[in-house]
Design a protein with these regions (language model features):
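A short helix->loop->beta-strand "cap" motif at the edges of active sites that frequently abuts
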Residues: 94-102
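Charged helix-capping and loop-helix junction motifs
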Residues: 82-89
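ATP-dependent carboxylate/acyl-activation modules
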Residues: 1-78, 102-104, 108-132, 138-148
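Short glycine-rich, acidic/polar surface loops and turns
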Residues: 55, 90-91
């Protein structure tokens, strides 16, 4: 909040920063697609990332969007290859002439996880994603990209 004062979310720390429509957010927003509103009748995005990926593409194609921040979670019970479809979505955004977008993420997982963190990193980096060492690092970089 020191870098970007008005960040809205469907799960904000401050209730006055609740986003009006999480499927069609405006301004600087962080949307948690694992929140109850998105998982009623569907699997969590760690298991089925299709809603998150579709929303990421939709939002990244908007002309006012410059930075997309996300995380990838690995481990037992998670999607078998979460970065494969995600990398394709990001390549499609860049192919649509949106080269001026920054995609940043962190990976929560290990090389020993069934999805192999090294493999996930390679897939994302090959799509043009800046893969950070932690979610706090990714958020810090995203904030600095937005204000420059």
């Amino acid at each position: 909040s020191e870098i970007i004062p008005d960040v809205y979310s469907n799960a904000p720390l401050d209730p006055k920063h609740v986003v009006a429509d999480a499927l069609n957010p405006e301004g600087h927003c962080l949307i948690d697609y694992g929140e109850d509103a998105f998982t009623q009748g569907r699997l969590h995005p760690m298991i089925d990332p299709s809603l998150r990926n579709a929303q990421m593409k939709k939002q990244a194609l908007r002309p006012e969007v410059g930075v997309v921040l996300f995380d990838v979670v690995l481990g037992f019970g998670c999607h078998e290859n979460p970065s494969e479809e995600l990398a394709q979505v990001i390549k499609e955004v860049y192919a649509a002439g949106k080269e001026n977008r920054y995609f940043l993420c962190s990976i929560t997982g290990l090389d020993e996880d069934p999805q192999d963190a090294r493999k996930q990193r390679q897939l994302l980096e090959s799509a043009g994603v800046i893969v950070c060492g932690s979610n706090s690092e990714a958020a810090y970089i995203a904030g600095n990209l937005i204000v420059r």
